């Protein structure tokens, strides 16, 4: 559906974001090495409650996501509730939409508020690429199940004798799409070739991302939305993202070799987002509930949309498909936006989506629209840098983008912002945010 869909409660309330917070993001195996995503999620949620000053007992719903799952704690949301002082009666469940996971968490909390089943909720996500669910081979897994049913030592030894040495090796988590076997970088390479995205363009975008993120940190605008994280063994604190290159120089990017297509590729480690650890969350409630609690909203959720396309080609075009829906449901055009924040999984993916925003042919043949969304004004685009610089803890990125965009809109005196992301599985997400002066 693409008609205007007002996001209001039965009482006519808008859906308010009251506060947002994240941990500093850290590259894999650095500051959060050995710290599970659950602990990062509890850390940011606890601090969010403290900073807001809201009684934890008032939280009626927590929806949280995690992409790299922890088998020992499959419902990260419920564990966060139990570990942060909220009421045991606070409902909680976990979601996963790959890189758009916290967008989904926000949508779910918004829907519950609109339905009237809750008035106050928290949405967010956490991921750790440093604490991974290392598995075992299928042969060993089957043998272990059979051994559990074996009654005698002889039966167990017979089962073990059928294993080969290679069956005992650990199995690292897959980094490719289950349905295609393609890595994200393979798709980014394909998109770069299909849409004529050059190596120079990708490196320029990556450099821009780091430069703007460094400026954001140096100016202090991120201080209030990023907590200082103290994690075991509590010897050091992290107060800034450790992936941002404060000394980024464009000429350095050309020195790196392609990471996926080694001979003819243009996607490198420098123009891609790195594996990252971190967590982010937002506090949401109905507009009238915020007023009754004496809380001033950061802004409001004007609309949202999700999309799904094929995974064989162009799998990372989610923003080009989801954004037109979100804008239509908000009743606004691209030119009405004050800010546009797009997840930078890869520079190639980002530039391909921007190119299709302006393509009439794509609009007609793929979206069924008469005309393209339009050319994106780069002065409005990823003005504080993006995921290439900050990093990308999969389930946390959406909440980071929402909080960052709302705060920047407030600094600019209000307006509308579009946040949008691609996701594995050919998925996409987009949300229109509103800040009133």
UniProtKB/Swiss-Prot annotation:
Enzyme Commission code(s) on record: 2.3.1.16
Active site positions: 99 (acyl-thioester intermediate), 392 (proton acceptor), 422 (proton acceptor)
Keywords assigned: Acyltransferase, Cytoplasm, Fatty acid metabolism, Lipid degradation, Lipid metabolism, Transferase
Annotated GO MF terms: acetyl-CoA C-acyltransferase activity
Catalytic activity: an acyl-CoA + acetyl-CoA = a 3-oxoacyl-CoA + CoA
A Gene Ontology term for the protein's cellular component: cytosol
Alphabetical list of CDD domains matching this protein: thiolase (cd00751)
Record carries keyword NAD: no
Alphabetical GO biological process terms: fatty acid beta-oxidation
Compartment annotation: Cytoplasm
Presence of the UniProt keyword DNA damage in the record: no
Gene3D superfamilies reported for this sequence: 3.40.47.10
Top-level division of the source organism's lineage: Bacteria
Record Pfam families: Thiolase_C, Thiolase_N
InterPro entries on file: 3-ketoacyl-CoA_Thiolase, Ac-CoA_C-AcTrfase_FadI, Thiolase, Thiolase-like, Thiolase_acyl_enz_int_AS, Thiolase_AS, Thiolase_C, Thiolase_CS
The protein's annotated pathway: Lipid metabolism; fatty acid beta-oxidation
Function: Catalyzes the final step of fatty acid oxidation in which acetyl-CoA is released and the CoA ester of a fatty acid two carbons shorter is formed.
Similarity comment: family membership: Belongs to the thiolase-like superfamily. Thiolase family.
UniProt-listed PANTHER family: ACETYL-COA ACYLTRANSFERASE FADA2 (3-KETOACYL-COA THIOLASE) (BETA-KETOTHIOLASE)-RELATED (PTHR42689:SF1)
UniProt subunit comment: Heterotetramer of two alpha chains (FadJ) and two beta chains (FadI).
Name of this chain's protein: 3-ketoacyl-CoA thiolase
Organism: Pectobacterium carotovorum subsp. carotovorum (strain PC1)
Lineage, uppermost ranks: Bacteria, Pseudomonadati, Pseudomonadota, Gammaproteobacteria, Enterobacterales
């Amino acid at each position: 559906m693409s008609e205007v869909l007002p996001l209001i409660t039965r009482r006519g309330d808008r859906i308010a974001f009251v506060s947002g917070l994240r941990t500093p993001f850290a590259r894999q195996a650095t500051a959060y090495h050995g710290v599970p995503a659950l602990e990062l999620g509890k850390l940011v949620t606890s601090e969010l409650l403290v900073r807001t000053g809201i009684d934890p007992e008032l939280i009626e719903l927590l929806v949280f996501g995690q992409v790299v799952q922890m088998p020992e704690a499959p419902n990260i949301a419920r564990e966060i509730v139990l570990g942060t002082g909220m009421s045991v009666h606070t409902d909680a469940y976990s979601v996963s939409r790959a890189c758009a996971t916290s967008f989904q968490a926000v949508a779910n909390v918004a829907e519950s508020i609109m339905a009237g089943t809750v008035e106050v909720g928290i949405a967010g996500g956490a991921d750790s690429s440093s604490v991974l669910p290392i598995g075992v081979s299928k042969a060993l897994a089957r043998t272990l199940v059979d051994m559990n049913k074996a009654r005698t030592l002889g039966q167990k030894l017979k089962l073990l004798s059928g294993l080969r040495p290679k069956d005992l090796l650990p199995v690292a988590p897959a980094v490719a799409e289950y349905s295609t076997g393609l890595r994200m970088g393979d798709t980014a390479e394909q998109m770069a070739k299909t849409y004529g995205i050059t190596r120079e363009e990708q490196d320029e975008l990556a450099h821009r991302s780091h430069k703007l993120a460094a400026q954001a940190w140096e100016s202090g605008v991120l201080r209030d939305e990023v907590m200082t994280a103290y994690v075991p063994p509590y010897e050091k604190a992290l107060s800034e993202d450790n992936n941002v290159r404060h000394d980024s120089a464009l000429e350095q990017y050309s020195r790196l070799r392609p990471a996926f297509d080694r001979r003819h590729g243009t996607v490198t480690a420098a123009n891609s987002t790195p594996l990252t650890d971190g967590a982010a969350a937002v506090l949401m409630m109905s507009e009238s509930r915020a007023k009754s609690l004496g809380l001033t909203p950061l802004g409001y959720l004007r609309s949202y949309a999700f999309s799904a396309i094929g995974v064989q080609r162009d799998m990372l075009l989610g923003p080009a498909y989801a954004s037109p829906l979100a804008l239509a449901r908000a009743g606004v055009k691209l030119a009405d936006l004050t800010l546009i924040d797009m997840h930078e999984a890869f520079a190639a993916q980002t530039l391909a989506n921007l190119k299709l925003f302006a393509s009439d042919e794509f609009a007609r043949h793929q979206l069924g629209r008469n005309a393209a969304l339009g050319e994106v004004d780069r002065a409005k685009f990823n003005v504080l840098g993006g995921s290439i610089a900050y990093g990308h803890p999969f389930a946390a990125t959406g909440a980071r983008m929402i909080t960052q965009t709302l705060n920047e809109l407030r600094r600019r005196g209000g307006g509308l912002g579009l946040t949008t992301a691609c996701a594995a599985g050919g998925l996409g997400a987009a949300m229109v945010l509103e800040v009133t002066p």
